[in-house]
């Protein structure tokens, strides 16, 4: 497996792949000051590869790079200490960290990050390039649009719809639908412009 991006996020993916026994060939990054990461060689070669995982935390940058690279198969990494229902679906390129629970009927899009200790309950639909931060809890039947960021320790009430490119602040409690492009913070979560 090849990783794209020698970031802190890459370190966590390395831990997951090592725990799974998945061989890591090398890491690709354009920063000339990084020659290795956790003992793995970092190269500048953005060539065509058979199988890779995007290891950049920023959803926006992740999407830009994925769209311009020629990778035949985007792998996924699911930590062995994550609990994922056999009746859930996880898209290509998605990374699921330790302590995560993804329940039955949940559909997780492509190139998402479901971070440490987050929970996604039954029948949720999570779009592509979404980041569910550590300790965030998503109740059943929630829909989250592409490119959204659900902040650390936040919680989302059942059957809520969160639009595309939304940022939910750390510790927020989302109890009503959130429109596209909004940043919402607080308990209950409100559009930041309302403060």
Residue ranges and their predicted role:
Residues 14-16, 64-68, 108, 179-180:
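Short amphipathic alpha-helical segments
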Residues 9, 57-60, 190:
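Short glycine-rich anion-binding loops that position phosphate/pyrophosphate groups of nucleotides
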């Amino acid at each position: 497996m090849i990783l794209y991006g020698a970031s802190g996020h890459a370190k966590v993916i390395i831990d997951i792949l090592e725990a799974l026994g998945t061989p890591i060939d090398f890491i690709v990054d354009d920063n000339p000051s990084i020659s290795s990461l956790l003992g793995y060689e970092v190269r500048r070669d953005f060539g065509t590869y058979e199988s890779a995982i995007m290891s950049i935390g920023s959803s926006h940058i992740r999407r830009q790079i994925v769209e311009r690279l020629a990778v035949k198969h985007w792998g996924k990494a699911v930590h062995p200490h994550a609990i994922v229902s056999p009746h859930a679906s996880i898209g290509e390129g998605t990374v699921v960290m330790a302590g995560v629970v993804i329940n039955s009927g949940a559909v997780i899009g492509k190139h998402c990050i479901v971070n440490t200790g987050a929970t996604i309950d039954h029948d949720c639909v999570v779009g592509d390039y979404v980041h569910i931060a550590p300790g965030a809890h998503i109740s059943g039947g929630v829909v989250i649009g592409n490119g959204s960021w659900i902040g650390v320790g936040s919680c989302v009430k059942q059957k809520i719809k969160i639009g595309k490119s939304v940022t939910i602040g750390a510790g927020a409690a989302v109890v009503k639908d959130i429109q596209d492009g909004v940043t919402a913070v607080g308990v209950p979560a409100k559009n930041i412009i309302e403060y």
